[in-house]
Regions:
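Intrinsically disordered, low-complexity segments enriched in proline/serine/threonine
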Residues: 19, 67, 81, 98-100
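A gly/proline- and charged-residue-enriched helix-loop-helix capping module
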Residues: 90-125
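Active-site loop segments of alpha/beta catalytic cores
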Residues: 1-39, 45, 62, 66, ...
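Aromatic- and acidic-residue-enriched segments that line the glycan-binding/catalytic groove
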Residues: 75-96, 146-157
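A generic structural signal for short, solvent-exposed coil/turn residues
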Residues: 3-5, 59, 89-91, 100, ...
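An N-terminal, globular interaction/scaffold subdomain
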Residues: 31-82
């Protein structure tokens, strides 16, 4: 008889912002993401709460120079780079408002200069301040997915573009992908991680993995995926080493 030693499967628990707000009064307004003092304070409170209530994590966590929370997900950075207005609420994740750009506006899109475009310019300045104060920086932020961001730029018309304006669709996907590569390579160089704010499970495998949100992929057919999205996912995989969340 063959006896096998079962290996434990690591699991991580992520709670909705509304749970944090109702249970501990943590607000997810803009300051949660951009006030570094408040962010460090909230991170400490959240880690203590998880241990005290569920015995998850360390019993006596200390403050750390974190740039993005690993306890909630919210892919607003890349849509914001393309000019999407972001709705912040006390008890919800950030909500990018689609721009619904016209065809000419879409074709004029270029890859943003991340060092000089909000919110990356603000986050980069934050990184520098944390680096100077603590000597290191940890964490990252949810970078969203290729199709997700394309929809936030173009709106639901983007689904029709696959059939009516394929060149336009490819242009949007190309620009979005290059922006994702720019932000991803920058973040990995600064903190060593890319996806803790998307799915903390990566810490149990390889924290440098690029695992991104791609919720909307299930809304397109396999044929559309192969023809339009796969080439850009493949480029991300080759340059940033990533896994897709579907």
């Amino acid at each position: 008889m063959l006896h096998c030693m079962a290996r434990p499967i690591p699991a991580e628990v992520i709670f909705n912002p509304n749970w944090w707000y109702r249970s501990f009064g943590i607000s997810f307004e803009e300051s949660f993401y951009f006030d570094r003092r408040l962010r460090i304070q909230n991170d400490l409170q959240m880690r203590r709460a998880l241990y005290e209530r569920f015995r998850l994590g360390a019993p006596n966590p200390g403050p750390r120079p974190i740039v993005g929370s690993e306890h909630v997900a919210g892919g607003f950075v890349r849509p914001a780079l393309f000019g999407c207005k972001i709705l912040f609420e006390a008890n919800a994740a950030p909500n990018p408002i689609p721009r619904d750009l016209g065809a000419e506006e879409v074709l004029a899109l270029t890859v943003p200069d991340i060092a000089n475009t909000w919110p990356m310019n603000q986050l980069i300045a934050d990184l520098e301040s944390l680096q100077n104060e603590f000597g290191c920086v940890c964490g990252d932020f949810d970078l969203d997915g290729v199709l997700n961001t394309a929809l936030q730029i173009r709106g639901q018309q983007f689904f029709l573009d696959f059939y009516e304006a394929p060149q336009l669709a490819h242009h949007v996907l190309s620009v979005v992908t290059e922006a994702q590569i720019a932000v991803g390579t920058y973040m990995r160089a600064r903190t060593g991680t890319l996806s803790l704010s998307t799915n903390r499970s990566t810490i149990n495998v390889d924290p440098s993995i690029f695992l991104h949100s791609n919720c909307s992929v299930q809304m397109v057919s396999p044929h559309v995926y192969e023809q339009f999205l796969f080439p850009y996912e493949k480029r991300l995989a080759e340059l940033v080493r990533h896994i897709v969340v579907m």
